[in-house]
Structure formats: structure tokens, C-alpha cells
């Protein structure tokens, strides 16, 4: 995923939330995404852990 991609994020206790990627930072353990959400328009960081499906919080949104 890259900047300006439409995504959904997994948050505690609720459905996936739509957002837009503002920044991407790669690390050896995974990738961090700064995602703009309705409640956080300036963005909040989410970490996708490499190699662990339970550690994936940001996914590309399906195209309509």
C-alpha cells in the first residue's frame, strides 16, 4: 500500500473503519501506516506485523 490508498483498519471492539494512508514507514518487523480516520483526520499510526495474520491491522479497501 502507498500514500493516498483507501484502506480499512481493524480497531478493538468494532467493525473495520475506512481511512486513507497519509504516510508509510518500513521496518524489519513490518510496516507502519499513518492513516486518516473520520475521528482522527490528522492520522493515527497502525503497525502491520510481518508474517502474523493477527498482526495485520491495515488492509487495502475493496474497489466498488
Swiss-Prot record:
Domain of life the protein comes from: Bacteria
Alphabetized Pfam families for the sequence: DSRB
InterPro entries attached to this UniProt entry: Dextransucrase_DSRB (IPR019717)
Family designation: Belongs to the DsrB family.
HAMAP family, A to Z: DsrB (MF_01549)
UniProt name for this protein: Protein DsrB
Organism of derivation: Salmonella arizonae (strain ATCC BAA-731 / CDC346-86 / RSK2980)
Amino acid at each position: 500500500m502507498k500514500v493516498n490508498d483507501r484502506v480499512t483498519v481493524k480497531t478493538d471492539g468494532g467493525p473495520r473503519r475506512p481511512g486513507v494512508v497519509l504516510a508509510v514507514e518500513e521496518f524489519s518487523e513490518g510496516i507502519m501506516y499513518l492513516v486518516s480516520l473520520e475521528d482522527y483526520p490528522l492520522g493515527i499510526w497502525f503497525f502491520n506485523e510481518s508474517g502474523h495474520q493477527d498482526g495485520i491491522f491495515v488492509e487495502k479497501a475493496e474497489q466498488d
